[in-house]
Amino acid sequence: MATKIKLQRLGKMREPHYRIVVADARTKRDGRVIESIGQYHPKSDPSIIKVDAERVGHWLSVGAQPTEPVLAILKVTGDWQKFKNLPAPPPMKVAEPKADKREIFQAAARAAAGAEDRPATTPKKAKKSGSAEEAEAAPATDAPAAGQ
C-alpha cells in the first residue's frame, strides 16, 4: 500500500487549519487517515507548526512520501534534514508570549485611580450671563418711542 504524508484541511472559510496526516495515496484530501502526526495553522503570526518528529521519522523510514506542502513544512521544522542527514535549518520564529489579562486589568485600574485625582483637561466654559443680558437690554431702552 502506497502511503502519503499530506495535509487534511479543517477550519472555516478563509481560516484554514490543517492536520498533517498519513493516509493511503488513493484517499481523498479529507478522507480516511491512518495516523495524524501534526498540525499546521498558517493564518496565525508566526504560523503554528506542531509535528511529532518521532512518528514522521518512522513513516519516512517505511516509505511514506510527503506531498510538496508537507515537504516544505518538514524542511522548516528540520525533520526532513534529519531524515536525509543534511545540515539543520535556521531556527524558527517564535511567537511572543501574550500579556496576562489580569495584569493588563490591574494596570488600567491603577491608571484610572491616578486620573481621578487630577482635574479634567478641558474645564467647562463659564457662562457670560451678565454681558449677554446687558446686550439684550440696551437696544430696548435706547430706542425712541415710535409715537413721538
Curated annotation (Swiss-Prot):
The keyword Ribosomal protein applies. Residues 137-148 have a biased composition (Low complexity). NCBIfam families: PRK14520.1, S16. InterPro entries: Ribosomal_bS16, Ribosomal_bS16_dom_sf. Belongs to the bacterial ribosomal protein bS16 family. PANTHER family: 30S RIBOSOMAL PROTEIN S16, SMALL RIBOSOMAL SUBUNIT PROTEIN BS16M. The lineage of its organism: Bacteria, Bacillati, Actinomycetota, Actinomycetes, Frankiales. This is Small ribosomal subunit protein bS16. GO terms for molecular function: structural constituent of ribosome. One of its GO terms (cellular component) is cytoplasm. One of its GO terms (biological process) is translation. Transmembrane segments: none annotated.
